[in-house]
Amino acid sequence: MRENVKRVLVIGSGPIKIAEAAEFDYSGSQALKALKEEGIETILVNSNVATVQTSRKFADKLYMIPVTWWTVERVIEKERPDAIMIGFGGQTALNVGVDLYKKEILKKYGVKVLGTPIEGIERALSREKFRETMINVNLPVPPSLSARSEEEALEKARQIGYPVMVRVSFNLGGRGSTVAWSEEDLKRDIGRALSQSYIHEVLIEKYLHHWIELEYEVMRDKHGNSAVIACIENLDPMGVHTGESTVIAPCQTLDNKEFQDMRSMSIDVAKSIDLVGECNVQFALNPLAYEYYIIETNPRMSRSSALASKATGYPLAYVSAKLALGYELYEVLNKVSGSTCACFEPSLDYVVIKIPRWDLDKFENVEHSLATEMKSVGEVMSIGRSFEEALQKAVRMLDLGEPGIIGGKVYNSKMTKIDSLRMLKERRPYWFLYASKAFKEGATIDEVYEVTGINKFFLNKIKNLVDFYESIKNNKGLDQKTLSIAKRLGFSDYQIASAVGLSEKDIRELRQKYGIEPKVKQIDTLAGEWPAVTNYLYVTYNGTEDDIEFSNGIRKLLIVGAGGFRIGVSVEFDWGVVSLLDSASKYFDEVTIINYNPETVSTDWDIARKLYFDEISVERILDLVRKEKFNYVATFAGGQIGNTISKKLEENGVKLLGTSGHSVDIAEDREKFSRLLDKLGIKQPDWISARSIEEVRKFVEMVGYPVLVRPSYVLSGSAMRIVYNDTELVSYIKKATEISSEHPVVVSKYIDNAIEAEIDGASDGRGVYGVVLEHVEEAGVHSGDATISIPFKKLSPETVHKMKESIHSISRELNIKGPFNVQFVVKNGTPYIIEMNLRASRSMPFSSKVVGKNIIDLALTGVIKGFDFDEFVELKAKSWGVKSAQFSWAQLKGAYPFLGPEMRSTGEAASLGVDFYDALLKSWLSSSPNRLPDQKGIALVYGRSNVEYLQASARNLSEYGMTVYTLSDAPIYGYEVTSSGKSVELIKDRKVEIVVTDGYLKSLDYEVRRIAVDYNVPIILNGRLGEELTKAFLLRKSNMTFYEIGEYGAGI
């Protein structure tokens, strides 16, 4: 019997953070679809402006406001929903739901919790209650004791004996968790661990060194009917967070008894917490004896459940939402097979491998070793019919410049066996690259196992790949049989060509001559036992025939997805892909997506007519164009990855939709683009295209420091840096040329104290639609880290007119057909162009939703039909919109928090308002761990740059009612001075409510900034933002507006 509800409130997860990423865009979107199918009105609270979920196609009503209990209470008071769903927005949504329950807000308004009851959620997420629950139902857990203070934690650790694992309650991503090998370790880390717990509780647990970690995904309905959807095996052992682990499904190394015993126990765990919906249950298995423990469960959609869903084809989030409405498993249809019910457990005739993606090089002082805390910012998933094939594909998907596990930079480096084993022992990211290098240099399986704890089954497979590669490299022979084996082992044409001394084109032609072609296979959830009705596809060389027939004689488009997320490429580009899909369906008979990110909406089973879950490379796309006969390939929606390969695709005869690959190359190549601006008479900062440090030094002698070093073909400011002296210059030029060695480095004069602005737009080669965006922070802070407003606040109409004229001129010269983004710095009213991207931009979901027009849809209209004008038409907002960056400093242990031209944020949030300060305050509060500071607390304000803005910030905070302190080494005049050491103690004692600073001061305030983020204290890293935000505290603290997005005249 279905729950009798007509209006349901769904809580989203807010902006993308490390450990709480786009998997909740996918799961929340599926839940909203399931509700809509039932005719239920949906109300969504989510401040993540970048997601598809916050577009009109999913929820009936949308509140883009901070995801907190007190803001959600305002929505409940206004909308009066019958029920609430809190299992589809990560830990953020669960915490909000628990707070609403405990404060009796749900009871007050008669709101029913759908899915797992709050008491069950608490039993799962409180480490102490979970341990007690497991013991009560006779399920094995490691020796462990809970603690709520530092003294108690030290005492419990002595009772258990070192080493111990510290686990944090009501938390995700392992934030604050650690392995303590001694009391000294525990004393150092326990304060941070307790600060990261929502309920100030930790579990001190026996550390299970080198045990195998496994996960089971369980579905359960309200009557106790259960299905185990997937068993996922972590290749990395216990001690590495599961989000940091390379994982494989189905499990490979379990015997039948182990598999069945843990399967049964996972169902018992679900029963013990009264699960309704989906959970994942984590186990530790002793590799040397038949011994295992239950580690934890997550009673919600999670990173693992998103992976399991994409790996098996089983729509977990959709089914979970149906179960939360009261359906039983047998009543829910599996829409992938179209004929089986949700109680059928999936069966796989392929293997899936997930590898995380890290961006640790962007952060100073960060710990690079993998451990109990998540640091990865994204992940990729590959599908193959052998471990070797899937692993090689996954490595290429990481987009690190590695052609596979073998034959790349690490494999061909001068690293010795000892060096490789050291990197493995230190648990550096991408361990498989160092393992293959170690085997190449003569390491044994036992030696690699000793330092990694990785099962020898997997190590043997990697060593076999090394042995095969070395054999063809040494023999230089490539007959039909050898080439066929190489392709079945996952080697790319490039890898094979490098081994035997031929070109990639030679290998492609040889393959086609021998008839060695990849086969298209279909994911049906039941290993071919039932036919599938959806085209959820992958490509393999381990097959003899295609599972599908290819349609001809119709208009077909292939859209290139965004690939794995990283800093600079996140869910906003998936929004671009899905927006293009929706728009293209009006003009094409069959629209197909190729992508390999398990977190995204674009890789859902029911989004595209066809989905290729496969690698994005020139080789793969040429294979698919040969089979499918696509009329066009669209590379502009998914960010940088498509732009990077567009020119090569065009050179190989592929017809690109929109702007030509030649024009894209001009815009992406800093030197070519700078020459174009000179030709058109458009202002830009003084620049030089340099191929040597000597050339740069001559340029610097003319223009003076500081200068900006900018390599070509990069995203999110990779290797981009403001340099202030010769020492920094030598260091950064070296780094930049390593990133883009085929292209010269452009060095430009850095214009300080300038306003930065952008225009998002679409063109048909003549007419232009555009939205003007303005940064709060001065130029020099990467646009992805900046606070951005629509409409502009500081720019003059005359300056904006010049910006529009420049863009109109460029769009005609390059014949831009599609979306674009242009960035300007403005000094004394004069705009200078610093960058142009001929693709969807990071800010496009924000600009589209604020002005109420989908720029991707406009762009495709321009490409297909053209516009009926030849001018710049500005798209204007009816209210104010502000976008704020979400940083994940707390997850990146040791990293020094500061802003610069290289991007470091992991996500973004936005809000709308009746004025700038209304929108700004809500937007900032939407990013974690930001909160309104307690007026009785201390504010710490200091810095050596933007001092006048810091002075204003201190003045505003003082007027707000706070006690303002400043650092003796970088003081703000007129306020009580304190030392760095004293400031650290004040933060640890939880007396500091907010820190406002500016610039790069690592030598004097590293510990202050680091302790602030470790103890969840909001930190503002720019003086100009500090002044505006503290003014917002004064103006808008008690009168923020909380309207539905349509009431602001916004939304798409």
From Swiss-Prot:
- GO BP terms in the entry: 'de novo' UMP biosynthetic process; glutamine metabolic process; L-arginine biosynthetic process
What PROSITE patterns does the entry give?
ATP_GRASP, CPSASE_1, CPSASE_2, MGS
Q: Which residues bind Mg(2+) 2?
A: E296, N298
Annotated keywords: Amino-acid biosynthesis, Arginine biosynthesis, ATP-binding, Ligase, Magnesium, Manganese, Metal-binding, Nucleotide-binding, Pyrimidine biosynthesis, Repeat
The free-text cofactor remark is: Binds 4 Mg(2+) or Mn(2+) ions per subunit.
Region (Oligomerization domain), start-end ranges: 400-548
Region described as Carboxyphosphate synthetic domain: 1-399
UniProt binding sites for ATP 2: R710, K749, I751, E756, G780, V781, H782, S783, Q823, E835
Q: Which GO terms describe its cellular component?
A: cytoplasm
* Cofactor(s) required for function per UniProt: Mg(2+); Mn(2+)
**Which stretches make up the ATP-grasp domain?**
131-325, 674-864
Entries under InterPro entries matching the protein: ATP-grasp (IPR011761), ATP_grasp_subdomain_1 (IPR013815), CarbamoylP_synth_lsu (IPR006275), CarbamoylP_synth_lsu_oligo (IPR005480), CarbamoylP_synth_lsu_oligo_sf (IPR036897), CbamoylP_synth_lsu-like_ATP-bd (IPR005479), CbamoylP_synth_lsu_CPSase_dom (IPR005483), MGS-like_dom (IPR011607)
Pathway assigned to this chain's UniProt record: Amino-acid biosynthesis; L-arginine biosynthesis; carbamoyl phosphate from bicarbonate: step 1/1; Pyrimidine metabolism; UMP biosynthesis via de novo pathway; (S)-dihydroorotate from bicarbonate: step 1/3
Residues that hold Mg(2+) 1 according to the record: Q282, E296
* E.C. designation(s): 6.3.4.16, 6.3.5.5
In this chain, Mn(2+) 1 is annotated as bound at Q282, E296
- Known catalysed reaction(s)? hydrogencarbonate + L-glutamine + 2 ATP + H2O = carbamoyl phosphate + L-glutamate + 2 ADP + phosphate + 2 H(+)
Residue positions annotated to bind Mg(2+) 3 are Q823, E835
**Do you know which SUPFAM superfamilies this protein is assigned to?**
Carbamoyl phosphate synthetase, large subunit connection domain (SSF48108), Glutathione synthetase ATP-binding domain-like (SSF56059), PreATP-grasp domain (SSF52440)
Protein family according to the UniProt entry: Belongs to the CarB family.
Assembly behavior: Composed of two chains; the small (or glutamine) chain promotes the hydrolysis of glutamine to ammonia, which is used by the large (or ammonia) chain to synthesize carbamoyl phosphate. Tetramer of heterodimers (alpha,beta)4.
What role does it play? Large subunit of the glutamine-dependent carbamoyl phosphate synthetase (CPSase). CPSase catalyzes the formation of carbamoyl phosphate from the ammonia moiety of glutamine, carbonate, and phosphate donated by ATP, constituting the first step of 2 biosynthetic pathways, one leading to arginine and/or urea and the other to pyrimidine nucleotides.
This protein is called: Carbamoyl phosphate synthase large chain
What is the scientific name of the source organism?
Sulfolobus acidocaldarius (strain ATCC 33909 / DSM 639 / JCM 8929 / NBRC 15157 / NCIMB 11770)
Lineage, top ranks? Archaea, Thermoproteota, Thermoprotei, Sulfolobales, Sulfolobaceae
Gene name of the encoded protein: carB
